[in-house]
Amino acid sequence: MAGPRGTRFGKYTLLNRIAVGGMAEIFLARQEGLEGFEKTICIKRIRPHLSSQENFVRMFLNEAKLAAQLNHPSVVQIYDLGRINDSYFIAMEYIPGRDMSRIIPKAERAGIPFPMIYALRISSSVCEGLYYAHTKTDAYGNPLNIVHRDITPENILVSWDGTMKIVDFGIAKANTQIEQTRAGEIKGKLSYMSPEQAMGKTLDHRSDIFSLGAVLYEWVTGYKLFTGENEMAILKSIIDGKIYPPSYFKEDVPEAVERILMRALEKDREQRYQTAWEMQFDIDTYLASCDFTPSNIHLSNFLKQIFDDEIEREKEMLLRARREEESPSITDGDDEVLELEDVGGRALLDSASGAPGDLDDLSGDGPRVRSQPTSIGRPGSKLEARLTLALTRRELEALFRLAEQHRLAPEDLARELLRDHLKWLG
């Protein structure tokens, strides 16, 4: 094994899979160099079943080439683009923190309201990053016409040190693309779409301004701007529905903040803010008039207050990755292995009864999976389960059924493991 807990993936060591979506897997990884140089990064790797689809691979590569041209403190940095065996990947900046779709609910559960002034501070940084991307030019001064098209709470990340990053310019549209997205194709999260996006029209940067307005509206009022029983109902609401002033839901919304939101949310884009810089200027003007303006330090302290347990678990995971020289793993290429454990602190597998425990006895006299002891800390802490899989068809099938039965968080990874082994066994 080339390094602790993971597999060599070119010049990188994969440490843990931290997310998976329809398009790609995201791995926490380490880049190593001369004289002990190390850098923690993220690897975004196309999922195996998509690597053979030529059109998708081309879209992925075009996305990476576009995103790699963005270099701004408010945008996640792309470091590398490559292919190892049949796996295409992007190496990108690792940001220890949480996205806003997790921060606000976590604060609410802790009984700590998320201050509106913090929401405005974050939105100002989003505006700055968007304006940079929207006005980005190539080496010859030609505009790239970048539009993010998916500004949502999930794509706005705040690090533990209080810095804000826009993530996933993955469905950005630019003239640099080899093939333009079909005109009527709708992408992005429905509830934050601009009216022109919902109608499948050609987009420009003002669509992102509307989406940010929808996000900020939700943070300020506590209500999602567009809702509906199904996708068509949401789209109809975006196109035809009335947008109520924020004070309709929350009486104490300052008049200046309400003006900012209503201008950003103009359905006619000609009446909207014409640049993200204009929106940022109005937000910053309001913040300057307040008795208190939050800094990155204030945001950092707020996050540490509500995420203290998760921050410690992530530190422990990184330290453990350094200590452990060998880990049970799955094959990834020639003699490359990856441990089956996710960063979020959930077990890969529990016992057949649903309670964490001994994994040796799955089904009475049925197939057995050899295991090392499982250690359990206090409720909600990281549950470690290390498995050594016996390479027999019955045992693998039993493990597959167990993962399916309990709908475990890393089930996609378990499925891929089992499919790979079953294919190998013939």
Identify the meaning behind each predicted range.
Residues 1-16, 36, 110, 286, ...:
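Short N-terminal regulatory/linker segments that flank and modulate the kinase catalytic core
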Residues 1-244:
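Conserved ATP-binding/catalytic core of the eukaryotic-like protein kinase fold
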Residues 103, 174, 237, 286, ...:
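Residues that scaffold the ATP/ADP-binding catalytic core of kinase and kinase-like folds
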Residues 130, 134, 283, 421-425:
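Hydrophobic recognition helices of helix-based DNA-binding modules
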Residues 364-391, 400-403:
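Short Lys/Arg-rich basic patches
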Residues 393-412:
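Surface-exposed, Lys/Arg-rich phosphate-binding patches that contact polyanionic backbones
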